Amino acid sequence: MRSISVLGATGSVGESAFDLLMGAGGPERFRTVALTGGANVARLAQMARALRAELAVTAWPERLADLRAALAGSGIEAAAGPQAVAEAAARPADWTLSAIVGAAGLPPGLEVLNRGGTLALANKETLVAAGPLVMARARETGARILPVDSEHSAIFQALHGENLDSVEHVTITASGGAFRDWPLERLARATVAEASRHPNWDMGQRITIDSASMFNKALEVIEAHEFFGLGVDRLRVLVHPQSIIHAMVTHRDGGSIAHLGAPDMRHAIGYALNWPARAALPVPALDLAALGSLTFAQPDEVRWPALRLAREAIGAGGAAGAVLNAAKEQALDDFIAGRIRFTDMAPAVEHALALAAREAGFAQSPRDLGEVLHWDDFARRAAAQWQGAA
């Protein structure tokens, strides 16, 4: 029986994974080693009971008593806190999904790699903040990383059997998010509620707002650079409102291989779960005739300056990815809390990058988790101080 763990089980990606696991046989087919989640301990306990997990962990220490109460009589072990999440990731499992949102996903992701496990990676921040460290650790231990972001899963599939040297460039598509068609002058007045409505994908609030600002795509460009080893000159972004083509690989002979699929995370999760095989998934096949047409446009970097910042971070190298990621998280926190405007997020991130570039050691890629966390803390403080946000 295959053993699995899901980190971030109660988020949108975790819910999709749970749906797939239960549909594929649940505890009759999988031995669930550990599930981790956040504040929603009632849902975490419900999932743990359904999958007969050995361990359930909430990242919130103050919710441990509630989790234990929800698991009473089940025989499932309960734990709490970030260290407990990392320890859960360190437990041997054949396949571990990392779906924790933000930089909090890095320590448990490294624990999976340290034990040489298979890491199905939906947490893009792991590679953005610590790409060289993460990829080196995987090589050292023989661990395998399978991309679960829909775009990177699409690239991974389109590259199957291909020589990377023959690739001219890779195109990642973007829906354009909630404000794709808004007049530029209106963006400064955008509310959190408006930014939280995605036209195509059903996702959590933070990633939906990141989609509206295009910071989600900026992180994905950096992630593709780190995972596939592609230079910034071989990475492109196209606005594709229908979210049907997730990525395209264009070869030097002029031909392109695209991956098409419904905007449903269950496809990428299911592909990673069953790789290298393919299995039937509860995702409807595309009806291209019903779709009628697919449209594309070049992204406007005045509207979406995050894309420029991603290219600059790749060019700078060193700690730039860690700084961009943490500054973005802080700016997003400040926007959600009403401390800054939607259009202030990119300037706050750019401010943090400019300050970090003056610091000793910025040009050096983080060599361990401690160095990643140093730059994470620096960037959050710098972004929070931008124009008085604190």
From Swiss-Prot:
**Which InterPro entries does the entry link to?**
DXP_reductoisomerase, DXP_reductoisomerase_C, DXP_reductoisomerase_N, DXPR_C, DXPR_C_sf, NAD(P)-bd_dom_sf
Pfam families from the xrefs? Answer: DXP_redisom_C, DXP_reductoisom, DXPR_C
- Positions binding 1-deoxy-D-xylulose 5-phosphate in this chain are 124, 150-151, 175, 198, 211, 216-217, 220
Which keywords belong to this entry? Answer: Isoprene biosynthesis, Manganese, Metal-binding, NADP, Oxidoreductase
The molecular function terms in GO held by this entry are: 1-deoxy-D-xylulose-5-phosphate reductoisomerase activity; manganese ion binding; NADPH binding
Q: What is its EC number?
A: 1.1.1.267
Catalytic activity line of the entry: 2-C-methyl-D-erythritol 4-phosphate + NADP(+) = 1-deoxy-D-xylulose 5-phosphate + NADPH + H(+)
Enzyme class, spelled out: oxidoreductase
Q: Which domain of life is it from?
A: Bacteria
Metal-binding: is it a keyword of this entry? yes
Which residues are listed for Mn(2+) binding in this entry? 149, 151, 220
Task: State which pathway it belongs to.
Answer: Isoprenoid biosynthesis; isopentenyl diphosphate biosynthesis via DXP pathway; isopentenyl diphosphate from 1-deoxy-D-xylulose 5-phosphate: step 1/6
One GO biological process from the UniProt record? Answer: isopentenyl diphosphate biosynthetic process, methylerythritol 4-phosphate pathway involved in terpenoid biosynthetic process
Q: Write down the required cofactor(s).
A: Mg(2+); Mn(2+)
Query: What positions does the entry give for NADPH binding?
Result: 10-13, 38, 40, 123, 125, 204
State the similarity comment.
Belongs to the DXR family.
Q: What does this protein do?
A: Catalyzes the NADPH-dependent rearrangement and reduction of 1-deoxy-D-xylulose-5-phosphate (DXP) to 2-C-methyl-D-erythritol 4-phosphate (MEP).
Q: What's the protein called, per UniProt?
A: 1-deoxy-D-xylulose 5-phosphate reductoisomerase
Task: Please give the organism.
Answer: Paracoccus denitrificans (strain Pd 1222)
